Design a protein with these regions (language model features):
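A short glycine-rich, hydrophobically flanked beta-strand micro-motif that places a catalytic Asp/Glu
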Residues: 115-116, 184-196
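ATP-dependent carboxylate/phosphate-activation module, predominantly the ATP-grasp catalytic core
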Residues: 84-98, 102, 116-182, 206-231
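Active-site nucleotide/adenylate-binding loops and adjacent lid/helix of ATP-dependent enzymes
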Residues: 22-113, 134-135, 168, 172
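A glycine-rich beta-turn/hairpin centered on an aromatic-Pro dipeptide
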Residues: 238-239
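A short, GP-enriched loop/loop-strand-helix hinge that lies immediately N-terminal to
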Residues: 1-24, 37-42
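A short beta-strand motif that forms the metal-chelation/ATP-contact edge
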Residues: 198-208
Length: 239
């Protein structure tokens, strides 16, 4: 938002506000994934604003149980209502409608995503952290498998233990998405293995280093070093 002012005195190795919103607002992120052919869960978008969609009329093209989560985590942070959770796991239409109504009654005015459940426990989750240089080329990737996730209502999805792994197919998919939009800097993806057929679904991208980024350092690459080498020392980061 204040990039034009700040970059007069600081080096800012981050993307602009427009692209940030396009990637971090999950409904827009899924639309972008569809454009470039990156696989995501089947999703229905519900307008949770006060004069938005009617919870009673929502129909789904996939069976229960389903997952519901806010499109904008930043805006949802300020919403307060009984039973609030970071992610909702809903067994039937009654639970879905009650949840949609509860969210809609709060101060949250954004979209809510209703998604098919991708089966699998914590170990089905994958973490990918990438670094794209100032020209938008992905120069580094660190991939891991989640071993244990946070179970607290507002911490669901946060990995507590990660094991380093390798998967060039997923890295290639992520790089194709990032390079299509001219992304620069660090990106952190949440991805899940679909146990039914061995395919993967991209859940979201954080336009920053994740809270789990220290797993990169344990794997041999201090993530801060990449920014220092390119932006302060003028070096080229080779993949």
């Amino acid at each position: 938002e204040n990039r034009a002012v700040l970059e007069k005195s600081f080096i800012i190795p981050y993307i602009g506000e427009d692209l940030l919103n396009r990637l971090t607002e999950k409904d827009r992120f899924y639309a972008l994934c569809a454009e470039v052919g990156v696989p995501v869960p089947r999703t229905v978008v519900f307008d949770a604003s006060a004069d938005g969609d009617d919870p009673a009329t929502v129909t789904l093209p996939f069976p229960f149980p389903v997952v519901a989560k806010p499109a904008s985590s930043a805006a949802y942070h300020y919403a307060d209502f009984p039973g609030k959770q970071k992610v909702f796991f809903l067994r039937d239409a009654t639970e879905l409608r009650a949840t949609l109504a509860a969210v809609q009654s709060s101060r949250y005015e954004g979209k809510l995503l209703i998604q098919e459940t991708i089966p699998g426990d914590d170990t089905s989750m994958r973490i990918l952290t990438t670094y794209s240089d100032r020209d938008g080329k992905v120069r580094f990737a660190s991939f891991g498998q989640t071993l244990l996730e946070d179970m607290r209502p507002m911490g669901v999805g946060n990995p507590l233990a990660i094991a380093s792994r390798t998967d060039e197919t997923i890295v290639t998919e992520a790089a194709r998405l990032l390079e299509a939009v001219g992304y620069t800097g660090f990106a952190n993806f949440d991805i899940k293995l679909d146990e039914r057929d061995g395919s993967f679904r991209f859940f979201e991208v954080n336009t920053r280093c994740g809270r789990n980024t220290y797993y990169m350092s344990l794997g041999g690459q201090n993530f801060v070093e990449l920014i220092v080498r390119e932006f302060l020392l003028g070096e080229t980061i080779d993949y």
